[in-house]
């Protein structure tokens, strides 16, 4: 038998669980995209799609600079091109299989120049496009080829020797996937009683089971000014998958029927029903060149960018974070010159905005429950988000321990893990 004489040691495996990286600001964006530009548009409807780059986003749901029509593209641009952060999850509700989302394109004559015809309509479904030379129907890929231009319009190139060869004009007809047909009900979504299929904001439930990621910020840019959508966003932030909590960034209406001046914002906030601790309300849009971005898209991207400066931890407010816009404006592009004093008036009503402080910055720490609810864990966005983040981290770190016998060793392991995370937070605080 071996004799242990002198100094000897044994090492036991560490019982402290390594913390799981949490994408605390994972944006889940529900809206519209030009999916007609895809080879299989139906595959990009009412399903959560994780995109890590601008190129991935364009491949997943299509892309257009017309943000008023295609709100997912606005969020994609705000995140990847404006603030330079990733990833985001996009959920498109514009459905080519839904007749309510279709506008029929009647016979339209387009001129042919050097064998090329340009269709200035956007949203065209190529599979339903009918192209005729006089009364002769042309066959795709035999008599002509069709491709999308960067702006979503379509170019038709006639094939030499095909039935359209030599034509000076073509007649086109078909179906257009029309984003103006989308309603608040499409964004809110629901569950089909017969099939169980989920649509709209109900798809948020699928993010964790499908992608293994926890929603952090829910968005429905521009649509969130609607009281029905605003209410649904706030409700969906609570008990996602029965466990997780999130926040939502909502636009306070600045259209012709909304708040056109800052003194009207408090009433508009109440009118929209933006009153919960989960909601962070933004009044005003931001303009970059000729492009107009909703406040919710810009502020959400700014918040996530700010998280990245603190090791993916939402312990700092997005307030006073720079956003590279050239002006703040109403939904229609009318410039609004907000100063700190006016911005503070909105903050006192639980609404954030954009002011110029050297650069343009997000301005406001308070959630929409303020001033009625002044509890710091509810009233301040960074505190609310940190509570959500801490709980999510705890759940993910300890999920493997569920249904295991609880003993002193396992309990101490949980305590040590949480203490370790707390020590990291303290050592990296900035």
Predicted regions and their residues:
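Short secondary-structure junctions
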Residues: 424-430
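Glycine/proline-rich low-complexity spacer/linker segments in large multi-domain proteins
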Residues: 118-119, 123, 176-201
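Extended C-terminal subregions enriched in glycine
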Residues: 407-415
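Short, hydrophobic/aromatic-enriched beta-strand segments in well-ordered soluble domains
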Residues: 168-176
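Extended beta-strand solenoid/passenger and fiber regions
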Residues: 85-150, 176-179
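A surface-exposed beta-strand-loop module
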Residues: 142-167
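A glycine- and small-residue-enriched flexible loop/hinge signal that marks low-structured segments
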Residues: 2-45, 49-55, 62, 68-101, ...
């Amino acid at each position: 038998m071996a004799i242990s004489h002198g100094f000897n040691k044994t090492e036991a495996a560490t019982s402290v669980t390594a913390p799981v990286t949490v994408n605390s600001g994972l944006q889940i964006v529900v809206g519209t995209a030009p999916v007609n530009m895809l080879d299989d548009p139906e595959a990009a409807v009412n399903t959560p799609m994780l995109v890590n780059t601008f190129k991935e986003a364009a491949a997943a749901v299509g892309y257009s600079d017309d943000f008023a029509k295609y709100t997912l593209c606005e969020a994609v641009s705000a995140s990847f091109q404006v603030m330079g952060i990733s990833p985001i999850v996009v959920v498109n509700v514009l459905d080519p299989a839904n007749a309510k989302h279709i506008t029929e394109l009647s016979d339209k004559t387009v001129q042919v120049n050097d064998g090329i015809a340009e269709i200035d309509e956007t949203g065209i479904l190529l599979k339903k496009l009918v192209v005729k030379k006089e009364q002769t129907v042309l066959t795709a890929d035999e008599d002509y080829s069709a491709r999308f231009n960067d702006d979503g319009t379509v170019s038709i190139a006639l094939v030499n020797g095909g039935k359209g060869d030599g034509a000076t004009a073509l007649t086109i007809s078909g179906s257009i996937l029309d984003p103006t047909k989308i309603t608040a009900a499409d964004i809110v979504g629901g569950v089909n009683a017969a099939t169980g299929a989920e649509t709209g904001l109900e798809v948020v439930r699928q993010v964790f089971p499908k992608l293994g990621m926890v929603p952090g910020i829910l968005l429905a840019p521009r649509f969130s000014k609607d009281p029905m959508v605003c209410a649904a966003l706030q409700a969906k932030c609570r008990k996602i998958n029965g466990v997780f909590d999130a926040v939502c960034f909502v636009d306070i209406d600045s259209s012709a029927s909304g708040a056109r001046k800052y003194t009207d914002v408090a009433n508009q906030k109440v009118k929209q029903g933006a009153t919960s601790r989960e909601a962070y309300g933004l009044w005003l849009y931001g303009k970059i060149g000729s492009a107009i971005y909703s406040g919710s898209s810009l502020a959400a991207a700014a918040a996530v960018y700010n998280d990245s400066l603190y090791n993916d931890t939402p312990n700092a407010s997005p307030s006073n974070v720079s956003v590279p816009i050239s002006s703040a404006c109403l939904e229609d592009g009318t410039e609004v010159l907000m100063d700190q004093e006016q911005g503070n008036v909105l903050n006192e009503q639980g609404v954030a905005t954009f002011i110029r402080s050297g650069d343009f910055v997000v301005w406001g720490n308070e959630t929409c429950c303020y001033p009625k609810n002044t509890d710091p864990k509810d009233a301040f966005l960074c505190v609310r988000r940190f509570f959500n983040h801490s709980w999510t981290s705890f759940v993910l770190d300890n999920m493997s321990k569920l249904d295991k016998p609880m003993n002193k060793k396992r309990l101490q392991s949980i305590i040590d893990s949480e203490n370790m995370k707390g020590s990291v937070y303290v050592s990296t605080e900035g």
